Amino acid sequence: IRLNIFETEPINGLAAPDGRIFITRGFYNKYQNGDITVEEISSVVAHELGHVALGHIRRRMIDFSGQNAVRAALGALLSRLIPGLGGFIASIIGNLLMARLSRRDEYEADEYASALMIKSGLGIEPQISMFKKLDKISNLQGSLPAWLMSHPPTKERINSIKKINAKIYGG
């Protein structure tokens, strides 16, 4: 698997619609400084591979097109009922829906990554430690209600990963 560098400082991993996997320059710099291990980067790559293998990027593009159509129709309707605010309300509803769909995709990609990490012999610990580090780096704890976030809260993701591990190992 070829890992590409996306030249931006924020710490992130990305999957492109064509299947390429990226980590940001900021992420790579954390690795170079010894703040992140190669096993933790492997967990991010496995997660992004999950997005590709499960068709999340393509699905998100389709969802986005549909969401724009619904947002426009809902905005037009609500603008007639609530002049001046209808478009704004429709936009909020659309964003909430997209955040929910994105969180579902994140859980699925986490599960895919966990299975890959376990199968490779690395186990789930690098995945869990990476989430904890990302949580500290991004300082997102408690900044937004979970229903507004595009990614599930770290504690929920870690608990989900532990459940997957228990399911695979029967414990």
Summary of predicted features, one role per range:
Residues 1-171:
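A Zn2+-metalloprotease active-site environment signal
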